Amino acid sequence: MKRCKSDELQQQQGEEDGAGMEDAACLLPGADLRHGEASSANSAGGPTSDAGAAVAPNPGPRSKPPDLKKIQQLSEGSMFGHGLKHLFHSRRRSREREHQASQEAQQQQQQQGLSDQDSPDEKERSPEMHRVSYAVSLHDLPARPTAFNRVLQQIRSRPSIKRGASLHSSGGSGGRRAKSSSLEPQRGSPHLLRKAPQDSSLAAILHQHQGRPRSSSTTDTALLLADGSSAYLLAEEAESIGDKGDKGDLVALSLPSGPGHGDSDGPISLDVPDGAPDPQRTKAAIEHLHQKILKITEQIKIEQEARDDNVAEYLKLANNADKQQVSRIKQVFEKKNQKSAQTIAQLHKKLEHYRRRLKEIEQNGPSRQPKDVLRDMQQGLKDVGANMRAGISGFGGGVVEGVKGSLSGLSQATHTAVVSKPREFASLIRNKFGSADNIAHLKDPMEDGPPEEAARALSGSATLVSSPKYGSDDECSSASASSAGAGSNSGAGPGGALGSPRSNTLYGAPGNLDTLLEELREIKEGQSHLEDSMEDLKTQLQRDYTYMTQCLQEERYRYERLEEQLNDLTELHQNEMTNLKQELASMEEKVAYQSYERARDIQEAVESCLTRVTKLELQQQQQQVVQLEGVENANARALLGKFINVILALMAVLLVFVSTIANFITPLMKTRLRITSTALLLLVLFLLWKHWASLTYLLEHVLLPS
């Protein structure tokens, strides 16, 4: 069977605290085997129960095909698991209401039991063993197996499971505990400190038949083996469901501990007793959650620092690498970044979950986990099997005649009562809420509603053996007391009966198998519809996932293209900025050089102007001095002036002559070659001038002899 969506959501919230999930799945075939052994022992032990009794009939209705029983057990077990998981979300009810309900049930039981107390058998009984039945007299009892009433009484007289108690045991040790004797106390269990209060009538019968050998009740023992196997099957299913349950859901299962707790009319309920939570436990839970929150916060900081380091390393490597290396580095960085982002998101989810749990604990206080609750239920169901074996084997002497008459009906009824309850749970949940998924949403309306209706709904859902068709808790309690009384008085009649027509139809109708098959077909149809809807949902989710993946890939491709364009544009801008900087530097150098040259030219022009002004001032001063000195001797000055002019003219002529000669000589002195040739020419002329006489003599006598 597939789990519903709410179960998966609850399992995801507590994934960090998950334990072994499939411990009890392997024990189901063993439960079927033990059930088969019990049925064979039942059929074999019938003739040996008493010499004067009739042989028990062949239990024909119990011989179902193994495949059908297996399918039925699997389907009912899964529905039982879903029902239990959603029934544990109830709120607290007051203890005064429980006490009042138990007192009303006791009063109704006493009023209904007054009709049978006048019989001779009832007068001989002790006050603790009075019977309560819907029958008018002892001879008008219906043909209901009396031992089954004792089973109902044992189940209804279970002790309350205390808050905080749990079974620290694995699935493997559960099989050994189921095989141990019912009278031997279980070792290592927290239930040793609280004794199971037995019913007063059952205690009297056990005390009366304590000395009887167990061989006289072989049929009862065989029947109880079958019933114990059914109870063990339910216990293992409950344990497996508890292991699979979400540990984050803090709920508690507590049975009423009122004055009528040990009586047979105390139905099992899911009420949590009112009272302040344990401060030490609350403080420890808050400290534990604070430590987890600090740890998750440190992990988030470490992941963020690692992501920042990756970003810095990527930027550092990307600046020093070429395009191919940048693409590879980018891919590696994106993978690391996505992984870091996923890790940080998961850590944030865990942090929010822990904060939400811390807020719930601070507001409502801590409560037990579903795993501990279901383990306590497992222990309770195992104790039920032990009490069934002890009870039926104990009153075998006075009751064995009535038991042998309905041997096959008892085995079928007990098996149906213990194993078929998950189907009744699921039917009740479906009739009240529409589906098991709506219980969490209807939790608040149940709180706001009348307390009698809430108590009736919870008691009808959580009573393990009673029928869900009772009108109220009082009727359920009266029916339970009636069945217990009929079981106590079964020595004089063929059997007892419950006061509910639903119970008679369920356990005595010949068309029970057809009804079960019809319900099984309905369950299969519902499962097929659920599978179809799940397949449609998966298909829709796959399409959405494909579409989102495609959109993400397109966006990623677009992002990569935009990033490449941005990188190209950034490189272009960087190149342009570099060129502009170079041009600005060259222009700055040019401007500085030009300004320096211009300033030097201006400075030279200013200096020349200052020199000319100075010369003019000197000339003016000289002229003034000459004018002052030549005032007395004007003629001398005139002659002197003329003489100076003549001298200047001669000097000018001389300078002209010198300049002319220099103009002739200057072309001969421009280069070194010309200077050398000019010097040689002058030397030759000097030699010729010096030896002119010899030269003339040579010319006259040698060259020109004629």
From Swiss-Prot:
Basic residues bias (residue ranges): 83-94
Any single biological process term in GO: amyloid precursor protein metabolic process
Membrane-traversing stretches: 646-666, 679-699
Presence of keyword Endoplasmic reticulum: yes
Positions in coiled-coil regions: 330-365, 511-630
Residue spans of biased composition, Gly residues class: 488-498
GO cellular component: endoplasmic reticulum membrane
Listed InterPro entries: TEX28/TMCC
Keywords carried by this UniProt record: Coiled coil, Endoplasmic reticulum, Membrane, Methylation, Phosphoprotein, Transmembrane, Transmembrane helix
Organism superkingdom: Eukaryota
Modification Omega-N-methylarginine occurs at: 163
Membrane topology annotation: Multi-pass membrane protein
Phosphoserine: residues carrying this PTM: 6, 435, 461, 467, 500
Localisation: Endoplasmic reticulum membrane
Region entry Disordered, spans: 1-221, 251-280, 440-459, 464-510
Family stated for the protein in its record: Belongs to the TEX28 family.
Biological role stated in the UniProt entry: May be involved in the regulation of the proteolytic processing of the amyloid precursor protein (APP) possibly also implicating APOE.
Assembly information from the UniProt record: May form homodimers and heterodimers with TMCC2 or TMCC3 via the coiled-coil domains. Interacts with ribosomal proteins RPL4 and RPS6. Interacts with APOE and proteolytic processed C-terminal fragment C99 of the amyloid precursor protein (APP C99).
Name listed for the protein in its UniProt record: Transmembrane and coiled-coil domains protein 2
Organism: Mus musculus
